[in-house]
Swiss-Prot record:
Role this protein plays: Ligates lysine onto the cytidine present at position 34 of the AUA codon-specific tRNA(Ile) that contains the anticodon CAU, in an ATP-dependent manner. Cytidine is converted to lysidine, thus changing the amino acid specificity of the tRNA from methionine to isoleucine.
EC category: ligase
EC number(s) given by UniProt: 6.3.4.19
Reactions accelerated catalytically: cytidine(34) in tRNA(Ile2) + L-lysine + ATP = lysidine(34) in tRNA(Ile2) + AMP + diphosphate + H(+)
Family, similarity comment: Belongs to the tRNA(Ile)-lysidine synthase family.
GO biological process: tRNA modification
Subcellular location: Cytoplasm
The organism's place on the tree of life at top rank: Bacteria
GO molecular function: ATP binding; tRNA(Ile)-lysidine synthase activity
Name of protein: tRNA(Ile)-lysidine synthase
Gene Ontology cellular component annotations, sorted alphabetically: cytoplasm
Residues binding ATP: S40, G41, G42, Q43, D44, S45
Comment, domains: The N-terminal region contains the highly conserved SGGXDS motif, predicted to be a P-loop motif involved in ATP binding.
Amino acid sequence: MSDKNSSQKNWTSWHHLLHKEILGNKTLIPDGANLLIAVSGGQDSMALLNLINDMKTQHNWFVNVWHGDHQWHKKSAKYALELKSYCNKKNISFFFDQANKNNISSEEKARDWRYKKLSERANQLLIENQKEIDIYLLTGHTNTDNAETFLLNLARGSNYAGLSNINKKRLLKHHIFLIRPLLIFSREDTKKFCQLQNIPIWEDPTNCDLTIKRNIVRKEIIPILETMYPGCSKRINSFAEKMSNYKNEQNDLSKLASLYCEDAIGVKRELLNSLCIEARCTILNTFLKKDCTKQLSSKNLTHLASSILVKDRGKIDLPDGFEIVWNKDYINLEKN
């Protein structure tokens, strides 16, 4: 029996489901890929680590682990050492970074720090390989995380783009991709998998801190909704997926509409102004994204579209040193 066939002998239904997902999307995690898995020690990331490590022979993957210590609780350094020992026993390369907790006092700052350090480690792997390869950063996001994010963004007043699914794959920078393979699983799935496989878990005590907004959604709001409407998390996740499809559809249609409104001189003002405010905002956003890296908020886009409608000529300063200028006939983007 070949190594590849024998490696499947002890696979669970979760292994086979993830394997099917990867085979169905060859570009998600290609065979022979260099992987850097972000592992916190919680059930989701530990499930991801073990699933990927069990499947690495099948796909000829090179597996590395990165762990970030936020120093948010007294045992964090101890957890990091224990996780390193766990990886060493499995012959998995382990990378570790420790934050200054005073510099990551919020969820957003902590997330930015994690992705910054992950990218630095990925760059290190690129340099060490001394050849042009891709690095795949893997995180343990599940569809339960997706439902939580949807509710948080809905409460913040996000537009339809903000209510879309978490992307399975996106390019972070040249040769570095962010991959979320576990979006086909729920948090209940990762819990059962870890229990069945006797996988150790290092639970972060801050996950129970109800001053953190996501924890309130996770520990209080979703359980109440599940009691009222059993299975609501799956339906929320399904709706977020539909919103992703809607976003993709809108992006494609807005590109066509933008081309229709443009010629070699610029965007035709009269044609743009003949459309509803929502369509004008969408087309202006598509037009601006060609050069402006920083996207305008919905509020600023609405203000811009309204100004272009009521004034025959004018200009408004934009991020990145640009300004949008218009006269009676045309709208253009210029560098200050």
